[in-house]
C-alpha cells in the first residue's frame, strides 16, 4: 500500500501541473498560494479526499482556488501551487441568451487521501465536501446577457452564480459541427492591378469545322500513278511474250536434233559418168578369178580355158558390149 500511495502521489503531481502553470496576471484576478504542512497517517486503507472550491465574484471575475493535500506515511511536507485560470475572450461586444458554462474538472485521484484546506475565501463552504474519484465542479451562470470587451480582456457576468457538485461526471456531449461554405452572390470588383486583363466570365472557344478529304482520284486521276500502271502493264506483257518466244526456240532446237539422227538413204550411182574413161578389165589380174565365187563374177571363157596359150587372144576375149542398152541422158 505504501508503494501504491507513492505512485498515486506522483501521478497526481504530474496531472495537476497543467492546472498550476502561472499565467499573465490581471489586475482583476487574484493568485493565491498555500503551503500545507499538515500530514495525517493512512487509516485502514480507506482515505477520503476533501476538496474545497472557493469561488469569488469580484467585478465579474471568476476566481477558483483548488487546494489538494496528500498525506504520506513518511510525514513529508508537500507544497502545491494553484493558480487561478485566466480566461481571455477575444470577441466583440454582443449579447446572448446563454453561454456555455465553465467547467473545472478534477483529475482522477486514488480514493483514500485525506486533506484539509484552509478556509481563506469569503465564499468558502463551511463543511468540506466529499467527492468521488471522478468529481467535477460546474459553474452554471444564470441565463442573462453577457458583455464581452476587447479593451481589458475581461468578462462581466452577473453575481448570481450557483455552484453545483456532482458525484459522477455527466456523459460527454458532442456537438456536430457543420462546415460553413460561403458562396459569392455577385462578382468581385476587378479594380486591382492584379486582375488586369482578367475577365470574370468564362471564355468560350469555338471549334473550327473539321476538314473532310474526299477521294477524287476517279474524277481527277493523279498523273503520278500513270507511270506505275504503265510499268505494271509492260511487265505483264513482256512476261507473256517471253514465254511464247522461249517455247518456239525450244521446239526449233528439238526439230534440228531429231532431223540429224535420221539414217542416210541408199542411192544408186553410175560407175562412170564419162564414156571415155577406161573401164577396169578383169583379165589384167595376176590370178584368175574364181568363176564360182558366190556366182557374182561373170563368165569368161578365155580365163577358164587352160589350153589356150598365154598372151593369145581369141575372138571371145573381150567383154561383150552389144547387150548394153543405150545410155540415158544424165539428169
Curated annotation (Swiss-Prot):
UniProt KW Transmembrane helix keyword: yes
Coiled coil region boundaries: none
Glycosites: 30, 44, 54, 59, 75, 84, 120, 136, 145, 152, 215, 222
Membrane side Cytoplasmic: residue ranges: 255-331
Post-translation changes: Highly glycosylated (N- and O-linked carbohydrates).
GO cellular component: membrane
InterPro entries per the UniProt record, alphabetical: Mucin-15 (IPR031371)
UniProtKB keywords: Glycoprotein, Membrane, Signal, Transmembrane, Transmembrane helix
Transmembrane helix is among the record's keywords: yes
Segments passing through the bilayer: 234-254
Signal peptide positions (record): 1-22
Residues on Extracellular side: 23-233
UniProt-listed PANTHER family: MUCIN-15 (PTHR45427:SF1)
The name this protein goes by in its record: Mucin-15
Native species: Mus musculus
Gene: Muc15
